[in-house]
Amino acid sequence: MNTNNSVMALATTFADRGDWTVEQQFVLQMGSSYLLAHGIGTPLQRDAVTTVEVPADGEYNLLVRTKNWTKHWSDGPTPGIFQVLVDGVADAATFGTDKVDWYWQRGGKIALKKGKHTLALHDLTGFDGRCDAVVLTTSDEMPGDSLDEYRALRARLLGPETPVDKGEFDFVVVGGGISGICAALAAARLGCKVALVQDRYVLGGNNSSEVRVGLGGQINVDPYPSLGYLLNEIGPDRIGNARGAHHYQDDKKLKVVLAEKNITLFLGYTVTEVEKMGDTIRSVVAVE
């Protein structure tokens, strides 16, 4: 697709997400997190709204990256549908009606002046409509639906087109759960320059306030009586599942990690690929 006179807005970066929720579980499968209209059958009351800046006067095609999530099981009407409003006017298309895999669905053609315009996602059913991105473009060519094509398009429109080098490290830990934190701390205290990469904005994995699973297991017992001291540093003072968020002491884990001068922490980064030399991993590539 010719990306001249094109703008992309990722749904999860909308200035106001309204009643839409962020779904982050499928980044590796479809390329990003996305917005979900989870109203349990009741249409969402508040739209997701943002502002985009159009580079020139022109006739712009409205393209939406979405999917028909029920087409796995039925060719009938889908419950997960929504509209897109441009400057408060709903496009005639209903989105989320076609393919079972993520795809670009074409809406209408809209005359726009150079400058700022509003976009809004308006849920129609409350039954889990899905929107990843909205594109306004003067090109009549449809972008490809494959994951590689999507990533390339997003890089051209939003940057960076080539990965930003975040530095070289002796030891890279992918995953900021309990085991990842312990591995990073141990390596850092042995003198390694460490990168700890976590795909959430909180450390702890299952033992974080997001999941709320208590720590368990035997530590400080023979034949390894010293095994467990790191857990005593970062673990919550109390055990138990499904307790209040404060029970899991996310701040305690973060404080210990940030205190280590040899650790560089990357929160909110999902590793999507590795680069190898022979059988040796040389680097990891992540998206924020």
Where are these regions (language model features)?
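Extracytoplasmic
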Residues: 1-163
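Short, hydrophobic/aromatic-rich segments at coil-to-beta transitions
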Residues: 35, 278-284
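Short beta-strand segments that buttress and anchor functional surface loops
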Residues: 121, 283-288
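Beta1/beta-strand and adjacent pyrophosphate-binding region of the FAD-binding site
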Residues: 165-177
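Residues that mark the start of a beta-strand
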Residues: 168-170, 191-194
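N-terminal Rossmann-fold NAD(P) dinucleotide-binding loop
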Residues: 180
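Aromatic pocket-lining residues of Rossmann-like dinucleotide-binding sites
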Residues: 187
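Conserved N-terminal/central alpha/beta ligand/cofactor-binding core
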Residues: 192-193, 198-280
